[in-house]
From Swiss-Prot:
It holds the Pfam family Ribosomal_S20p. It comes from Wolbachia pipientis subsp. Culex pipiens (strain wPip). One of its GO terms (cellular component) is small ribosomal subunit. The keyword Lyase does not apply. The keyword Lipid biosynthesis does not apply. One of its GO terms (molecular function) is structural constituent of ribosome. The lineage of its organism: Bacteria, Pseudomonadati, Pseudomonadota, Alphaproteobacteria, Rickettsiales. Binds directly to 16S ribosomal RNA. This is Small ribosomal subunit protein bS20. Keywords: Ribonucleoprotein, Ribosomal protein, RNA-binding, rRNA-binding.
Length: 89
């Protein structure tokens, strides 16, 4: 348990940040899951919109410091490869 006043405040701030970061990660995972489901269904019309949404969420997480930029780049690259494979098929 924190002994200093500033440490007690930081515990509250960390708890709030943790909730916000969990929300952002969850939103991003949901967007990725939706994109993968659309790719599996073979829906070429909605796949571009879903990809933009997933990519946007990943970039937002990077800008807020929730995930590392290399992690986001890797995920975007892999998703983009799946989208391109669907579009050419």
């Amino acid at each position: 348990m924190a002994n200093h006043k500033s440490a007690k405040k930081m515990m509250k701030v960390i708890a709030k940040r943790t909730l916000v970061n969990k929300m952002r990660k969850s939103k991003t995972r949901t967007a990725i899951r939706r994109l993968v489901d659309i790719i599996k269904s073979g829906d070429k019309e909605n796949v571009v919109l879903a990809f933009r949404n997933a990519e946007s969420n990943l970039h937002k997480c990077v800008n807020k410091g929730v995930i590392h930029r290399n992690t986001a780049a890797r995920k975007i690259s892999r998703l983009n490869a799946k989208v391109k494979a669907l579009m050419t098929a």
